[in-house]
A protein has these predicted regions:
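Membrane-proximal basic amphipathic "stem/tether" segments
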Residues: 1-19, 263-284
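A conserved beta-strand-loop-helix scaffold within acyl/acetyltransferase catalytic domains
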Residues: 2-44, 84-95, 100-211, 220
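N-terminal accessory interaction module
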Residues: 25-82
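A generic secondary-structure signal
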Residues: 69-70, 165, 221, 225
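Generic structural signal for hydrophobic
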Residues: 70-71, 122, 226, 248
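Conserved GNAT acetyl-CoA-binding A-motif
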Residues: 72-85, 226-237
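A generic structural-conservation signal
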Residues: 80, 130-132, 235, 257
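Aromatic (often tryptophan-rich) hydrophobic motifs at membrane interfaces
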Residues: 171-273
Length: 284
């Protein structure tokens, strides 16, 4: 069911950030495995199945087949499936959330006049520095966001694991916008491990130091890196809310893939069901 070559393929062909094995394994501490043409992450009795099949992210039949296989895993107590559609196996009581990924072609379309003005404004006050070092001021900016914002527990956990992720993934990159005196005004984290798709992972800014357009400037640094590496698309992530969605559409980003998350508890299989599965397994 699992092998390093297949997991490497999941990252190489990733269309969504959850398919980047080093990222999810680092922030969640879970065990990656391949289930059909989908990658999953197991932790105890819980499984997260990233139901975007590698050969075609929107293949509903392949998604359903992967869910069927996942539900046969011994000891499974809870499953969370993310994909382009709700899996048919999800019961009516499943917890469901929906969003959509936005993406930009690389090179990105020419920015509109207002965006060009914002970029020029930020360029006058900030210099871009890129690398994979996680400095104290990066950590301080994340901590400030944690203290100031009302964030979901899962988001807080991910933010707390950013240093671990950046160390674990050779495809990660931090683009920082610094003032002339070296102070950090904003930074973005990108992921470039996939062959054709780059990922805009995270962005933070200091409202006291960051001029207008700071977030746009660090994103432009990630887009330039994607262009330099020959990637053809940047997944900007989910819409999340009106403000974040506006930021992405301002760049010309368009809806890329639906995001449907369904989570439910798995009832233990009865004796007859287990016996039937054993017979099928032995005869195949």
């Amino acid at each position: 069911m699992i092998g390093p070559d297949r997991l490497a393929r999941a990252t190489a062909e990733a269309a969504v950030p959850e398919q980047v094995v080093a990222y999810v394994a680092a922030v969640a501490g879970s065990r990656p495995l391949m289930i059909g043409d989908c990658v999953g992450f197991a932790s105890g009795g819980a499984l997260v199945l990233v139901g975007y099949p590698l050969h075609e992210p929107g293949d509903a039949k392949a998604l359903a087949a992967a869910v069927d296989r996942a539900l046969q895993m011994p000891g499974l107590e809870r499953i969370t499936v993310i994909g382009a559609a709700r899996p048919p196996q999800a019961p009516p009581t499943a917890m469901v959330a929906q969003d959509i990924y936005y993406a930009l072609p690389v090179p990105a379309p020419p920015p509109a006049q207002k965006l060009r003005n914002l970029l020029r404004r930020a360029q006058r006050e900030l210099s871009l520095v890129q690398g994979r070092s996680w400095e104290n001021d990066h950590a301080a900016l994340v901590q400030r966001r944690l203290h100031e914002g009302r964030l979901a527990a899962g988001t807080r956990h991910i933010f707390g694991q950013l240093p671990r992720y950046i160390e674990a993934s050779a495809g990660s990159l931090v683009v920082s916008g610094r003032r002339a005196d070296g102070r950090l005004a904003a930074f973005a984290v990108g992921e470039f491990a996939a062959l054709t798709t780059a990922f805009f992972m995270f962005c933070f800014r200091d409202p006291e130091l960051a001029p207008p357009g700071s977030a746009d400037l660090v994103l432009s640094g990630l887009l330039e890196e994607a262009r330099r590496r020959g990637q053809t698309r940047m997944n900007l992530g989910l819409g999340v809310n009106a403000g974040i969605g506006f930021f992405k559409r301002k760049w010309g980003a368009e809806p890329f893939l639906p995001y449907v998350e369904a989570s439910w508890e798995v009832k233990p299989r009865g004796f007859i069901s287990k016996l039937r599965s054993l017979v099928i397994k032995r005869s195949s």
